Regions:
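Conserved ATP-binding/catalytic motifs of P-loop helicase motor domains
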Residues: 1-254
Length: 254
């Protein structure tokens, strides 16, 4: 977080109390926060250790596993780009595999095919998302899903489960660390689907962004907008995205 954001929140919360900005700065300095060079960003040492553990798990897990299902033939209904993404994920030899797709690229359709490929290899699949509405959307797309919070609460997974997390960019550092440790404890694998450019973590830290930035992993990516009719969008946000995309393409072509 930026130090000025922390100070703003403290001043609002402490309204009516006898302290000023100078006193607040002094307290922040005494807390021993770690500062990022050349920026206003600060973090706690505990959070830094958490992010470091996340990145190390992702980095050290590169190339350490067998491919999930390298011989699985993607469905003919997939676009060439979607088929490439499915093959890349199913051929992954990493403990953590990254998948990124913007709204309208057919991400859910692709994830459903990835799930089919993993299950065809005899591996259990656990699909998770941070919020209940996201879980409902995944279920509507034909996937059996649960909330991340419930999974972390019960602390139980099938052995060798492949855990697929949608909207992983919304997961905070502590939850990501807990999830990674849970998957490791059950000898599983982790697929993180999300776009840090669209959504950020609600809780402190951003686990997916740390992995993308420092682990050296390369994501399977969908870029082509498949749902180009705004009327077919599933939400107002997606409708606005598709409408804006079409306007941008039209402007670039004129």
């Amino acid at each position: 977080v930026n130090d000025y954001e922390l100070m703003t929140a403290a001043l609002v919360h402490g309204r009516g109390h006898d302290f000023d900005l100078a006193a607040l700065r002094e307290v922040i300095e005494k807390r021993g926060y770690v500062r990022e060079a050349g920026t206003y960003k600060i973090t706690s040492r505990d959070m830094l250790r958490c992010e470091y553990g996340i990145v190390v798990s992702a980095r050290d897990g590169r190339g350490m596993e067998l491919p999930l299902n390298p011989d699985f033939p993607p469905a003919s209904a997939l676009s060439p780009e979607q088929a490439v993404a499915v093959k890349k994920i199913l051929n992954s030899r990493d403990f953590i595999t990254l998948f990124r797709g913007s709204a309208g690229t057919g991400k859910s359709f692709t994830l459903r095919e990835v799930t089919a490929g993993i299950q065809a290899a005899g591996l259990p699949v656990v699909v998770l998302a941070p919020q209940r509405q996201q879980v409902a959307d995944l279920c509507a797309d034909g996937l059996t899903a649960d909330t991340l919070a419930h999974c972390l609460l019960i602390k139980s997974l099938p052995r060798r489960a492949v855990v697929l997390v949608d909207e992983a960019g919304q997961i905070g550092g502590k939850q990501m660390d807990m999830l990674i440790n849970l998957v490791k404890a059950h000898n599983g694998r982790l697929i993180l689907s999300g776009d840090t450019r669209q959504h950020g973590a609600v809780q402190a830290s951003d686990g997916l962004r740390a992995i993308e930035k420092f682990s050296g992993l390369r994501a399977a990516v969908l870029r082509d907008i498949r749902r180009q009719n705004p009327a077919l969008a599933r939400s107002a946000k997606e409708r606005a995205f598709v409408t804006g995309y079409r306007k941008a393409v039209k402007a670039a072509s004129s």
